[in-house]
Amino acid sequence: MADNTGTLPNVDAVLDTTGLYCPEPIMLMHNKVRDMTPGQVLKVIATDPATTRDVPKFCQFLGHELLEQDTASENNYLYFIRLA
C-alpha cells in the first residue's frame, strides 16, 4: 500500500457500507467494481472493524491497488482503491 496521504487522486465512485458487517461490505465492493473500469478510484466508507483485514485481502486477491487505508474516526474506516 502506498503512503499517498494528501495526494490521493480524484474519486470516481463512493461506496458507503456504514452499519454493515462481514460479509456485506466485501460483497457490495465486489458488485460495485463490476460497474467500474480499470484505473478508476473507489472510496469505501465502513464501520466494520473486520474491513481492516478484509479490504486489503480483497485488493490483493483481485489485483487492485489499495491507495490509502485510514481510520477517519474511532468507528469509521476509509479505503481508496484503484481498480486493476
Which sequence ranges carry the predicted segments?
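Short acidic/glycine-enriched loop/turn segments that link adjacent beta-strands
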Residues: 73-76
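Core SAM-dependent methyltransferase catalytic element
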Residues: 78-84
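Amphipathic, hydrophobic secondary-structure cores in small proteins
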Residues: 17-71
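Short, compositionally biased "basic patch" segments
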Residues: 1-10
